[in-house]
Amino acid sequence: MKKMMLAAALAATSVLAVSAADVYVSISTGKKKNAGTKEAPLKNLWHALQKVENGDTIHLAEGIYPGNAKCNWFLIDKAVSIIGGYSPDFSARNPLKHRTMFQPLNENNDKKGNGLGIFTIQFDMSKPAPKGVNMVFDGLIFDDGQAQSYHPVKGKPEGVETGMWLEPPAKGNTQFPSAKRYLVYSATANRAEGDITFKNCLFLNAGNIAVNLNWYKGKVKMENNVFCNNLMVGANVYSSNPKPGEVEWEFEKNTVLFTWSRTSELSDMGFGVRTTGNVKSELEDNIIGLSVLTGWDNTKGNDKTKKIEAEGNVFFLNRGSDAQVTKSPSVVKVAVDDFEDDLEGNYGIEKASENVGLADPKAFNGRINTAFLNAFLSMKYSEKASLDAGKLNAFRQAVGLPQQGTIVSKVDMFGNRYPLEDALKLFGAMAGKGAQEIK
């Protein structure tokens, strides 16, 4: 009986692979009752996701795509691919010209449902986990800046379009607090086997980790993406498999800039990328800079379960360090010039060669928002404590309790919204390093 069930499952998988379909969606020209062809596209991505099967590919024309009932997120519960950047009639594809965008609005933050990310990848647990998957997400723009809430005046440097990002439940002049969610999230419980790829995408203004991916077995590839102005971490991959090496992560030719700390105290997290235990990681030809704490964090997980290669990357102006590792009981901060000597052969890092600082800052002339950059480089956090010396504190001190007082804190900026148009200019900033122009 078990053999029959296994054969049936394998047969079903092969049939899906053979009969994989292409579905076309256009927010501007499509209709719900259309067939989903180039000539008669569907209107909404969420509707297409309900109709497709494992192995299918959804092609998205330009436009801003809302979730079901404008809920700001999409459930991806099948092993499908989503390709964006098409003209409305699907006659041409250019992701930077024909922008396929996920740009939720703050006014819809009350319609979150249970999605932890704008894209929440969570396979149907009532069915066998998909095997041999090859999911591709290509040419998509994720910008959560319009769903956040910013202080109207505090932490607003000259020339920067918003004040500082506000941690919920605080809010500025918006209907709801900030959307503290991932841009892409894959659930820990997922047991899919195969490959998943993100390429030619922009991940911008996240109120949490931009891409937080859990994978069970296979290859995770992130290539030619821009991660800009996100909180906590630009990208990390976790293995939900107890066996080391079952998950491989290739992080190649990405640009990761302006990664903020977890809170406005600027002291916790703020990693461009993070490598973790049980994952074989390759970091190659990336640009990683302007992180609040460190460009590359390697303190998560058991070093003995890691196999990491970091080669040909460019690190610059990371405020705390270019990399950090755990040397119990301390965290060691390492500058890029010392990677080969201090990191290679230690901490699960097999290769750490040809990584350099930014030789020519002119590469970013006209590519980076100068007001935002100047404010970030000048940023500081300060606090002033003022204790009440009255009878209450005298009594508390006498019985060994801490005194109470007030703390006034000030930060020059924190997670302020970065302009979309400037973020798109980061594609192609440096030949051969970081995200290249999309062809």
Describe the residue ranges of each PLM region.
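Positively charged n-region of N-terminal signal peptides that target proteins for export
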Residues: 1-4
